[in-house]
Regions:
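N-terminal acidic, proline/glycine-rich, low-complexity intrinsically disordered segments
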Residues: 1-3
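Mid-to-C-terminal functional-domain signal that highlights helix-capping/loop sites
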Residues: 5-411
């Protein structure tokens, strides 16, 4: 005679196997869906949502692995107990999807869209096939100069490099037009950065050593063991390639990665970016979200200078944190630099009848002419150079978001 509790027991095991299979599938799916939903372009992220999504993404490989094992165990139970054929097939399908989900938690979706450039290659300035008016990020350290074309950087976002024995991360975010170079040294450790996602329109970076997440436009770690730490900024300039090549004829230029050259941005990529939707509300400021700014931070104070105003004026003298500031436009009428002006007053010579000496400004005190590198080329001040000030271009929505107390230059 059959045991009276056997059908009930078997029914209970069936329900348990089904619930384990379903739970494993949904948890594995959640581990993928939550980070992808929160850390994606054109969606506002608040700190707690971002923190939760990054936490889930960090735990996802472990959670999904447990789910996959549980789902496989449920399938094994279903076959051993000879459950109905359709039920075994359903559990097997759920198990397969759970295993696939577990594998996908190890995949960086953003690097599938924008592939890294792990072994960057360089060529001479003379050999580089870069248009004269294309923009490059210029870095010079210990006498070694390199240029990173923005159309290349806009796809890869991050290039880990070493210039003048200094490990650096050259970074660029096309959505907010920010090109910044950061030191990769933290507490004596050399970090290697990869693209990790996006936060309110600005790229996120993850270091391979600690899995900390860093904001590209501030260099501040917002998640992980290094949370709250800030990378050291390395001075760089955004210049036209023709101007950089004239200044650094022996410099090296980042070569395009042949595998992904077809993916690089078009020459007029900025026009397309300016039409994209932003997630930071700038309406109260009265400034359009895609107004391009030259941002300067000194002594804890930030100020945004509209690029259009700088290009029109060709020279702007202002103050930030009581520091006299000089902004000048280069001889290519496109590149910009910022310097500490000291006690001197400068006037632009861009429209004067000066011969082609490289002079772009003259000081009122001595009449000395100064070039775009900030150095006097004649007069009593000949040979002296102004101190460069770190500055970078940024769309207004991103600058305002990361510098909430910023001042704005009004022409």
């Amino acid at each position: 005679m059959a045991h009276p509790g056997l059908p009930i027991a078997r029914s209970g095991k069936t329900r348990l196997a089904v619930w384990v299979g379903l739970l494993g599938f949904f948890l594995s799916f959640a581990c993928l869906a939550i980070p992808m939903y929160v850390i994606r372009p054109f969606r506002p992220q608040d700190p707690w949502q971002l923190d939760a999504a990054l936490t889930v993404r960090g735990l996802a490989p472990w959670i999904s692995a447990v789910c996959a094992i549980a789902a496989l165990a449920a399938v094994a139970r279903a076959w051993r107990d000879r459950m109905r054929h359709w039920l075994r097939c359903a559990l097997a399908t759920l198990s397969l999807l759970t295993v696939v989900g577990s594998v996908l938690t190890h995949v960086n979706v953003f690097e599938m869209m924008f592939h890294p450039y792990p072994q960057p290659e360089f060529e001479s300035a003379a050999a580089a096939k870069v248009d004269s008016d294309d923009k490059v990020l210029s870095v010079t350290l210990h006498g070694e100069s390199r240029a990173y074309p923005i159309r290349t950087m806009g796809y890869h976002h991050i290039v880990n490099d070493t210039v003048g024995d200094t490990p650096i991360a050259v970074t660029y975010c096309t959505l907010c037009h920010t090109g910044l170079v950061w030191s990769r040294m933290v507490d004596g450790q050399t970090l290697h950065f990869r693209l990790a996602g996006i936060n309110n329109g600005n790229a996120l970076m993850r270091d391979e050593e600690t899995s900390s997440i860093w904001q590209q436009s501030t260099g501040i770690a917002i998640f992980g063991p290094f949370r709250g730490r800030q990378l050291q900024l390395v001075h760089c300039d955004e210049l036209s390639f023709a101007l950089w090549r004239k200044e650094e004829p022996r410099g090296l230029v980042l070569k395009p990665d042949a595998q992904y050259a077809s993916e690089y941005d078009d020459k007029d990529w900025e026009k397309h970016i300016e039409k994209t939707r932003t997630v930071v509300d700038t309406s109260k400021s009265g400034i359009a979200p895609h107004e391009l700014m030259l941002g300067v931070t000194a002594a804890g104070e930030s100020k945004a200078f509209p690029v259009k105003s700088i290009l029109t004026a060709k020279l702007i003298q202002d103050r930030i944190a009581n520091i006299p500031l000089l902004l000048v436009v280069g001889p290519d009428h496109a590149s910009m630099r910022a310097f500490k002006a000291g006690p001197m007053t400068f006037v632009s010579t861009a429209d004067s009848a000066l011969p082609d000496t490289g002079a772009i400004t003259r000081d009122a005190e001595t009449g000395s002419n100064w070039n775009f590198q900030g150095c006097a080329i004649d007069g009593r001040m000949a040979g002296r150079c102004l101190e460069p000030v770190d500055s970078f271009k940024d769309y207004w929505f991103d600058w305002m978001n990361h510098h909430p107390g910023t001042l704005v230059f009004r022409s």
